Curated annotation (Swiss-Prot):
Keyword Transcription regulation in record: no
Tissue distribution: Major protein of plasma HDL, also found in chylomicrons.
Self-association state and partner proteins as the record states: Homodimer. Interacts with APOA1BP and CLU. Component of a sperm activating protein complex (SPAP), consisting of APOA1, an immunoglobulin heavy chain, an immunoglobulin light chain and albumin. Interacts with NDRG1. Interacts with SCGB3A2. Interacts with NAXE and YJEFN3.
Cited InterPro entries: ApoA_E, Apolipoprotein_A1/A4/E
Main location: secreted
UniProt similarity note: Belongs to the apolipoprotein A1/A4/E family.
Name of the featured protein: Apolipoprotein A-I
Length: 264
């Protein structure tokens, strides 16, 4: 029975209740907002039905059949509004009684909601606390391992340097021996080249005037210089970016090596 009364109340809310929605003089309760929404919904249905009836009357079929749906709809709406006004006092009393009867229910629901919120907050706090404890425990376990790893790395590096030191010394010694042997082997060739060059210079002096060769040599050098100057300039321009790149790479390598040594 209460469900039937509730349905009737929703359908036959008074117009004054709908207007109260727009006035907003006093803060509305949830029940007032519900009643105003129901009234607006009913008014919207009436307007939509009126527009639909007008469109059907204006159509070719409506004119041919002389439906007059709009007039009938207006009559029905007027009758409906009269009935709603007559039931206005009944619906008002129903909403007031329903609001009073459910005050305790809303209070209990708010209380239960607050208890749930407190329980959930307590659980979240406890969960956060446990997570922090686990993170701290993990950090305590990892920190000695990190120190041990760093210590082992330094020890391994030191051992590697000690092992490589004799090898480097041996390589340097062998390189010196190779250089000395190469110098000794090339000594005889350089001596022979110097002697041959001295003989050719002596023969050159005897076969032609020195001044003539000097003039020819100067001329050839001048011609070579003029021809080689553009090529040398192009070579210099081409080498400049390469040298700058090598310089930047070298400085970057030195910087990285310095950072690694500082970190150790």
């Amino acid at each position: 029975m209460k469900a039937v009364v509730l349905a009737v109340a929703v359908l036959f809310l008074t117009g004054s209740q709908a207007r109260h929605f727009w006035q907003g003089d006093e803060p509305q309760t949830s029940w007032d907002r519900m009643k105003d929404f129901a009234a607006l919904y009913v008014d919207a249905i009436q307007e939509s039905g009126k527009d639909c009836a007008a469109q059907l009357d204006a159509s070719a079929l409506g004119k041919q059949l002389n439906l007059n749906l709009l007039a009938n709809w207006n009559t029905l709406t007027s009758t409906f509004n009269n009935l709603r006004e007559q039931l206005g006092s009944v619906t008002k009393e129903f909403w007031d009684n329903l609001g009073e009867d459910t005050v305790w229910l809303r209070q209990q629901m708010n209380k239960d909601l607050e208890e749930v919120k407190q329980k959930v907050q307590s659980y979240l706090d406890n969960f956060q606390k446990k997570v922090n404890e686990e993170v701290e425990r993990y950090r305590d376990k990892v920190q000695p391992l990190g120190k041990e790893l760093h210590k082992d790395a330094q020890q391994k590096l030191k051992e590697l340097q000690e092992k490589l030191a004799p090898l480097g010394q041996d390589i340097r010694q062998r390189a010196r021996e190779y250089v000395d042997a190469l110098r000794t082997h090339l000594g005889s060739y350089t001596q022979g080249m110097r002697q041959g060059l001295a003989k050719r210079l002596e023969a050159l002096k005897e076969s032609a005037p020195v001044s003539e060769y000097q003039v020819k040599a100067s001329k050839h050098l001048k011609t070579f210089s003029e021809k080689a100057k553009p090529a040398l300039e192009d070579l210099r321009q081409g080498l400049m970016p390469v040298m700058e790149s090598l310089k930047a790479s070298f400085l970057s390598s030195i910087d990285q090596a310095s950072k690694q040594l500082s970190a150790q």
